Amino acid sequence: MLRGQEERKYSIRKYSIGVVSVLAATMFVVSSHEAQASEKTSTNAAAQKETLNQPGEQGNAITSHQMQSGKQLDDMHKENGKSGTVTEGKDTLQSSKHQSTQNSKTIRTQNDNQVKQDSERQGSKQSHQNNATNNTERQNDQVQNTHHAERNGSQSTTSQSNDVDKSQPSIPAQKVIPNHDKAAPTSTTPPSNDKTAPKSTKAQDATTDKHPNQQDTHQPAHQIIDAKQDDTVRQSEQKPQVGDLSKHIDGQNSPEKPTDKNTDNKQLIKDALQAPKTRSTTNAAADAKKVRPLKANQVQPLNKYPVVFVHGFLGLVGDNAPALYPNYWGGNKFKVIEELRKQGYNVHQASVSAFGSNYDRAVELYYYIKGGRVDYGAAHAAKYGHERYGKTYKGIMPNWEPGKKVHLVGHSMGGQTIRLMEEFLRNGNKEEIAYHKAHGGEISPLFTGGHNNMVASITTLATPHNGSQAADKFGNTEAVRKIMFALNRFMGNKYSNIDLGLTQWGFKQLPNESYIDYIKRVSKSKIWTSDDNAAYDLTLDGSAKLNNMTSMNPNITYTTYTGVSSHTGPLGYENPDLGTFFLMATTSRIIGHDAREEWRKNDGVVPVISSLHPSNQPFVNVTNDEPATRRGIWQVKPIIQGWDHVDFIGVDFLDFKRKGAELANFYTGIINDLLRVEATESKGTQLKAS
């Protein structure tokens, strides 16, 4: 009997030790997984979640083993009861409970320490960890009465696992960002605790930066300034270097845009007109409201001041253009005058001499606007030997006087003509005033001066403000001049209705004059040896004289547009780009091989450095995304890459690269700027009145 009881006791101990050994091995495996998860915490965010979930998983594993061991103990208790040894089994169970209670407290303390370490490692995800820890503690509490016996052999193993965790470097402030977050640095709604947020902001700011070649030295939009008060004004009395050109070049804002070949060009033009450009300014919304297409019953034009377009050398417009001569403003790509009028703008194209000097053209422009018979001035006529009076203009604005202004837009030589006319209006012609005092008689109001506030803005397109080597080395040579004057002589026959602009020199056959007599008379004209013509005025010397004659008006907004259609060859010279108008290939190479490197880049006829601004007058660089409303200073727009001299007016019918929609956008943008000039002026008037 006693021997049987001893065997049963031995069996109970054997089973208890076996169960404890199994559970100890299980806890060792679980603790190993827990240590591995701790090592992965500092490098992988996904591993953090696994580490957070492991206490709960550990508890679940313990619970299953504890339930199995509990069942085995119950079976043993039943066997002991049947054999009469229940008392000893209970003693053993109570002893086991006492030990397991102490072990449970120790393990819970260790788990709490481990949770604190995990909480420190998580940083910004502490709240999530606390929730996971609380879940683990609740699971441990549920099984604390059943897993005590099995923990005896696992205490040392758990202690070793905690030692491994403590040996790992603690990184409480480091946050691991998932890869999908880094893939979107410009997200507008990043997490508040994401350290990539500042980078995202910088990335967004970088997208709004201006082109590196665009210098923004302007004052806030719509601010009226005087050139003398502008700290950013730079006098360009020193000749600009080649580096000065690169800062103007606008490669990003090239007008060329990818166009679907199947898209109707007329529809593109219509879209451009229906949705005029809106500049990216703080007042863009208010400005956009001022620019709207013509409504069905609208009679009042959208612009307050008429816009007058002035053609350049060789330009013929309106009824004065031959049948095969292209439409000067826009060609067949975009008929600028016609389309802008359809949109409700008051625009006009002036008709002045195609071969005349800037002086004669400026006088003609005045009478084109004001109306009346052209008076070139007694002093000027006597000095150069041509007739004083010319043709008579009807006038587009007979009441033109100070306070009633116009906008002037000139292409090529037209920009020079505009500047000289405005100078005469404001300061008069000293030679004519002196001649009038000495000889009496009549004097044109244009020459008396004192007519300020009659021009709101001056905009020049590819204008040779500083001249062109093409005129010096080609256009103003004796051979070319003879060809030009011979053409005028031929077109002056009595059967021709085309006026090339030299009638004041006698290039018009009289009604009763034979053609032979007409040829003899014209051959004696002083024009053959005179400098009072376009060929000379476009030279470097002729343009320099004009620059010295003109000054800046602090009440006028000045803007220039420049194109470049040349590239640097292997020897450092400029060659015409492919697609440059074929008639300008020779002149482009003449300019591109100039001895001065800064004078080589060109649009086929005009060097870039000449088109930017007059060399002796103040200027400031502006971007395409800001309103050009400053006064008393040349606002230099970024150079347009790939535009040659005639791309500004669209007459190159062989250039299929330049679309009518481009011209529509270009001229609509100019009109928008002119409307903003008017808005700025009205605002200034209201402020003065208040």
Swiss-Prot record:
Location of the active site: S412, D603, H645
Cell compartments where the protein resides: Secreted
Basic and acidic residues bias: start-end ranges: 72-81, 225-237, 257-266
Catalytic activity: a triacylglycerol + H2O = a diacylglycerol + a fatty acid + H(+)
Ranges annotated as biased composition (Polar residues): 52-71, 82-114, 124-171, 185-206
Cellular component terms per the entry's GO annotation: extracellular region
Residues annotated to bind Ca(2+): G579, D644, D647, D652, D655
Family: Belongs to the AB hydrolase superfamily. Lipase family.
Name of the protein in its database record: Lipase 2
Species of the source: Staphylococcus aureus
Source species taxonomy: Bacteria, Bacillati, Bacillota, Bacilli, Bacillales
Gene, per the UniProt record: lip2
